[in-house]
């Protein structure tokens, strides 16, 4: 008989740096999942990524307390802030511009995010990322 799904848990965990402290511990603990087993598996899977880059993860918990997880690509906003060299986006994006990103940087981010974006080709993905950049108060060049 197939395992019955008990819950889906969505978290953002720093790449290669999952530990039992919040938010990971409480979220997994309330479903009875072995927290250290998840932390070891997650850290092993994300060791090739840049350290401490937040990685969205969807954990599927089954009724026998086993689990599987899927890692996604880092959020576009984090990648854009890193590319522009800023700490945070603008509070008033249409008035205050806090940085600039080039077309090449947008293409690089779109390539990274392509698996998680709802786009058919790279050009459409670049437009999605450019829209995110504008809504953060970044100027888009090119």
From Swiss-Prot:
InterPro entries: Ribosomal_uL11, Ribosomal_uL11_bac-typ, Ribosomal_uL11_C, Ribosomal_uL11_C_sf, Ribosomal_uL11_CS, Ribosomal_uL11_N, Ribosomal_uL11_N_sf. One or more lysine residues are methylated. SUPFAM superfamilies: Ribosomal L11/L12e N-terminal domain (SSF54747), Ribosomal protein L11, C-terminal domain (SSF46906). One of its GO terms (cellular component) is cytosolic large ribosomal subunit. GO terms for biological process: translation. Signal peptide: none annotated. Coiled coil: none annotated. Forms part of the ribosomal stalk which helps the ribosome interact with GTP-bound translation factors. Belongs to the universal ribosomal protein uL11 family. Part of the ribosomal stalk of the 50S ribosomal subunit. Interacts with L10 and the large rRNA to form the base of the stalk. L10 forms an elongated spine to which L12 dimers bind in a sequential fashion forming a multimeric L10(L12)X complex. NCBIfam families: L11_bact. This is Large ribosomal subunit protein uL11. The lineage of its organism: Bacteria, Pseudomonadati, Pseudomonadota, Gammaproteobacteria, Thiotrichales. The gene is rplK.
